Amino acid sequence: MKIYSVSDHAFKPYGKVLTGFDTAALVAAMKTIPMPESGTAYEPGIEVLEACGMFNEMRDRAYGGMPIQIGMCWGYNTKLNCLEYHRDSEVNVGETDFVLLLAKEDEIEDGMLDTAKVKAFRVPAGTAVEVYGTTLHYAPCQTTEAGFRVAVVLPKGTNTEKPVFEAKSEEDTWL
């Protein structure tokens, strides 16, 4: 699989690099969180990350003042094992370089995605990238044996417990 850079034109349909953010405090805060023994971990909101100086700027500049949460996905991953999407964009910032495996929601046909359509994009450490709401994504892939730590910024309440409701469409069952 070819690995593109998020600075390549090929990334444009999936997201964009956000400029003007000083991510140093967020990167330092991520380093304080221990790695899992194996696999990956995810928490939608982590106090030490939300307490760093970047929270208000991210809320205001990336989300127009909407309530946000800053959590993290971290651990060890080298493969495509799942894909998800949200109703809103997600911002990722890595403590080290990482790779995102991405596809487009509109490439789903009859509830299935041809994984040959998935593209890989390398994100440099400390770079803030917006992943559009229509982009399928999941746990990042590591670029070294040391694993990865990636901050995940989302609207408040995203990726928390699924609400109980009657599904009225196939997509409702995916939420």
Please report, for each region that a protein language model flagged, where it lies by residue.
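Active-site region of the double-stranded beta-helix
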Residues: 1-125, 139-146, 151-175
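Tight coil/turn sites that cap or link beta-strands
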Residues: 125-128, 134
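Alpha-helical transmembrane segments of helical membrane proteins, especially in multi-pass transport
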Residues: 130, 138-139
